[in-house]
């Protein structure tokens, strides 16, 4: 998989585990993959960040959430029911370069394991 134009220092600083280390824990990394444990507690907001590579995501727990772009515009409300995200779901996503934030507006933790495909 190709990396999404994140070769300069500014772009690298917006990578999820760098921009929001309290929400992204790297469990394993080599030259081909990176495995990340993603957690967002109730009421927490993950600051603006990007996803450098295509991913395979496993949802462990889910709560209602909002996703916003870099201007604060609402891009996704999980309560709309149009998302593949549900507990136990596995889904793929392309690299996601636009800056976005995630706000947990529910009562439970959002937690998932992400396998990022570097090549």
Task: Name each model feature, range by range.
Residues 3-20:
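N-terminal low-complexity, Pro/Thr/Ser-rich intrinsically disordered segments
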Residues 72-96:
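Short acidic-glycine-tyrosine-enriched beta hairpin
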Residues 102-106:
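Asparagine-centered strand-capping/turn motif at beta-strand->loop junctions
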